[in-house]
């Protein structure tokens, strides 16, 4: 039983794909920005400001540096192994099957939980937008049970519906997905630039003092919750999750060995610049302790402080569009990873069946889309969202370690992009990821271990038995045994009778 059997780079690249290649550098950059910019600006900046103060911009930079180093490693792997599956496929080549399965299992949870979490934030902004037109949904249908303290809620209906609508868009073809995402990202960027231009004049530098009230990492008296730049970076790291989903589009990308690295890096750079500018403006307009009053809608609080009430509607619209693209890219990435795992036999064939009309993994897309919609509708995601962070950081560590390993074991393999500064770059990526993981609470670790344990059960119960690589190795071994047996029989037939009699 070889749990660490590996796929070769050549076999991965040579396999035919029924998916349609239409994505170019611009589309991939828009895909990355669509995944990154959303929840971070419109939701997490409030919680981050309370944790780090005005130094939140440093927290964003720290998280961005971590993602930047990891992004360089992703870019190299994407140019070397341009197939669907992202970190799952890279781990299969570098470390073997069981590691690949566990990373794939981890990413499935990451994408599902992030989409479900974002659907909760989307619902909040959607309800505010409706209220502006005098439309009020029943409170019980505005959020999952237990989401809002002191308010009786049972089901997040808006979030449930939007996830199903996004699933429909994803299922009917990559061209429709590309157009939808490109248009929404351009609108979102225009609204963010408008916000920056209109609010920068209200910044009061006095609000940036003290710049780092909690230092890098500290505990306040009577509290078990860490405060400071590093804990805030662990929180806002959620904002950058999604660029890795770009690499899942390899089999739908034109010249993936060139365009994938560009799409990953361009989207990270653009998003980081916007995040830092936004956080400096927001903490410059509103003193950081004041974000406690509107922690779930920090941008709305900033607009209130400026008196630019007309901007509220525009920003609400931008938030809705921003979070819609995040969900779209997460659900897209999830379906492509499941497709890759199914194609390798580690998941049932159902998930890998490509619709002949739409050229998409239609059934798998709808299966996980419905599960994600149900999770977003019924489950209080607040207690689980840090699982997204630890899952993503684990994938980053595996990919970064994989680049180190492949540079050592296959130095001459073709790479359309080579990460600069190896081995320093992947080592720094691993170190930064470990630092951010250290900022997460122990409950997150427990849940993560439980999910991994479930993954091991699924692998040994199904994946190991149905692995196509395992079946191929078994057939090759049987054929080799047959050849050896045939050779032995031939030798015996040609031997003297006395020798044959003696050996038998």
What do the PLM-derived regions correspond to, one by one?
Residues 14-19, 56-57, 134-159, 183-316:
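Helix-loop-helix junctions that connect adjacent transmembrane segments
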Residues 123, 154-208, 264-268, 385-398, ...:
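Membrane-interface loop-to-helix entry segments
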Residues 20, 25, 154-160, 254-275, ...:
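Loop-to-transmembrane helix boundary motifs in multi-pass membrane proteins
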Residues 42, 83, 106-124, 235, ...:
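Membrane-helix boundary/coupling elements in multi-pass transport proteins
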Residues 1-45, 50-54, 61, 68-72, ...:
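Membrane-interface "cap" regions at the ends of multi-pass membrane proteins
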Residues 151-155, 350-362, 396-444, 465-473:
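C-terminal membrane-solvent junction of multi-pass transporters and transport-like membrane proteins
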């Amino acid at each position: 039983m070889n749990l660490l059997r590996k796929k070769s780079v050549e076999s991965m690249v040579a396999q035919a794909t029924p998916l349609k290649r239409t994505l170019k550098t611009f589309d991939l950059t828009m895909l990355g920005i669509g995944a990154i910019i959303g929840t971070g600006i419109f939701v997490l900046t409030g919680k981050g400001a309370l944790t780090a103060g005005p130094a939140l911009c440093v927290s964003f930079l720290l998280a961005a540096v971590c993602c930047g180093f990891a992004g360089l490693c992703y870019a190299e792997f994407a140019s070397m192994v341009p197939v669907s599956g992202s970190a799952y496929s890279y781990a299969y080549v570098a470390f073997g099957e069981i590691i690949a399965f566990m990373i794939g299992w981890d990413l499935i949870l990451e994408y599902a939980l992030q989409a479900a979490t974002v659907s909760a934030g989307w619902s909040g902004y959607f309800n505010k937008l409706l209220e502006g037109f005098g439309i009020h949904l029943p409170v019980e249908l505005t959020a999952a049970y237990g989401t809002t303290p002191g308010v009786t809620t049972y089901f997040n209906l808006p979030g449930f519906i939007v996830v199903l609508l996004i699933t429909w868009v994803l299922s009917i073809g990559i061209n429709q997905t590309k157009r939808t995402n490109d248009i929404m990202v351009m609108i979102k960027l225009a609204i963010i630039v408008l916000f920056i231009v209109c609010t920068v004049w209200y910044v009061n530098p006095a609000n940036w003092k003290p710049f780092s009230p909690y230092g890098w990492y500290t505990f306040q008296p009577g509290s078990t919750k860490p405060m400071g730049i590093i804990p805030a970076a662990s929180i806002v790291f959620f904002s950058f999750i999604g660029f890795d989903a770009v690499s899942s589009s390899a089999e739908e990308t034109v010249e993936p060995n060139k365009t994938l690295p560009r799409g990953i890096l361009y989207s990270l750079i653009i998003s980081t610049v916007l995040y830092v500018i936004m956080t400096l403006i927001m903490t410059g307009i509103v003193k950081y302790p004041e974000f406690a009053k509107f922690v779930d809608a920090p941008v709305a609080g900033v607009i209130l402080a400026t008196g630019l009430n007309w901007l509220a509607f525009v920003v609400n619209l931008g938030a809705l569009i921003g979070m819609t693209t995040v969900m779209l890219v997460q659900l897209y990435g999830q379906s492509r990873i499941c497709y890759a795992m199914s194609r390798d036999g580690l998941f049932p064939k159902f998930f890998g069946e490509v619709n002949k009309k739409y050229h998409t993994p239609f059934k798998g897309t709808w299966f996980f889309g419905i599960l994600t919609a149900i999770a977003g509708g019924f489950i209080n995601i607040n207690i689980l969202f840090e699982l997204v962070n630890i899952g993503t950081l684990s994938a980053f560590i595996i990919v970064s370690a994989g680049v180190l390993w492949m540079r050592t074991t296959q130095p001459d393999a073709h790479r359309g992009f080579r990460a600069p500064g190896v081995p320093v770059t992947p080592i720094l990526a691993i170190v930064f990821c470990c630092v951010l993981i250290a900022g997460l609470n122990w409950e997150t670790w427990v849940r993560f271990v439980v999910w991994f344990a479930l993954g091991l059960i699924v692998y040994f119960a199904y994946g190991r038995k149905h692995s196509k690589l395992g079946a191929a190795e078994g057939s090759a071994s049987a054929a080799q045994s047959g050849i050896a047996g045939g050779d032995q029989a031939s030798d015996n037939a040609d031997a003297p009778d006395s020798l044959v009699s003696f050996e038998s």
